[in-house]
Amino acid sequence: MARRSKGRFIDGIVLLDKATGMSSNFALQRVKRFFNANKAGHTGALDPLATGMLPVCLGEATKFSQHLLDSDKRYLVTAKLGQRTDTSDSDGEVVQTRPLEFTEAQLMSALEHFRGDTQQVPSMYSALKYQGQPLYKYAREGIEVPREARPITVFELNFISLEGDELTLDIHCSKGTYIRTIIDDLGEMLGCGAHVIMLRRTQVAHYPYDKMVTLEQLEALVAKAQEEQLDSSSLLDSLLLPMDTAVADFPEVNVPDASAAYLMQGQAVRVSGLVADKLVRITLGTERRFVGIGKMNEDGLLAPKRLVVIHDQAKAS
């Protein structure tokens, strides 16, 4: 007999404001438990040191988490100049201390180097894998392995302030960009070394900063529900963003009710006005209910790629 999943069928996205000092997986599990969700997944880990936006997908929304992983991000970062650490942040050991001898003009010139399309060699202290093992495990054993430079794009790099030896920047970048590596490379260009002492992710894709909630806020709502003898979902579920917001930048294709049953069985259906080889967001009928994503195939038909399972939101045991 197949095991029944624990938790309730609840679909949506929580914009968690992760606190410092905890792993992204720890935060994810707390959110999953608060919502009593049967499935949950995050959309790009933040270092324990980092705070800020961590979209958590619940239920069927997990099917679209990859699209948020691939999206642009924005960070506010403060670096301490004059010290380089083995992890490029304040969680590591200081390996070199040097005086600050650069001018303001040299700093601005160095910042310009990181704007636009560049190549970045990932830090050894990252979750990227080499021969099946995360790089940080090699680093902890004092082993350095070869890493290939990867293309990244820094759309914006804004100077915020330089107060003493602390430099603050606002960075809007493509997926896979390591802010710690930018800071480490910047420190070497300036000849003084640098490491991250504060990192906050302020944006993922199009999601608004003011929609974030903390674990403490979620915990308080659960406690309030218990105190008032309410189901906690009555207070928590209003915080969920619709799961189709994960693919809001995909063009919408509306499938008429007459073709809906065929589509939901995984069959391709004919819809006019589609562009070949482009992912689209599929809605059904006059209600325009989101049911997944698809792409036009070689026969000019809309082929579903990922469809959601429609639940009645009843609790599973």
Curated annotation (Swiss-Prot):
Source superkingdom: Bacteria
Database matches in Pfam families: TruB-C_2 (PF09157), TruB_C_2 (PF16198), TruB_N (PF01509)
Function, in words: Responsible for synthesis of pseudouridine from uracil-55 in the psi GC loop of transfer RNAs.
Reactions the enzyme catalyzes: uridine(55) in tRNA = pseudouridine(55) in tRNA
InterPro entries associated with the record: PsdUridine_synth_cat_dom_sf, PsdUridine_synth_N, PUA-like_sf, PUA_sf, tRNA_psdUridine_synth_TruB, tRNA_sdUridine_synth_fam1_C, TruB_C
Protein name from the UniProt record: tRNA pseudouridine synthase B
Lineage: Bacteria, Pseudomonadati, Pseudomonadota, Gammaproteobacteria, Alteromonadales
Annotated disulfide bonds: none
GO biological process: mRNA pseudouridine synthesis; tRNA pseudouridine synthesis
Assigned keywords, A-Z: Isomerase, tRNA processing
GO molecular function terms listed in the Swiss-Prot or TrEMBL record: RNA binding; tRNA pseudouridine(55) synthase activity
Gene3D superfamilies (alphabetical): Pseudouridine synthase, PUA domain
Active-site residue numbers: D47
Assigned protein family: Belongs to the pseudouridine synthase TruB family. Type 1 subfamily.
Coiled coil (residue ranges): none
EC number, as in UniProt: 5.4.99.25
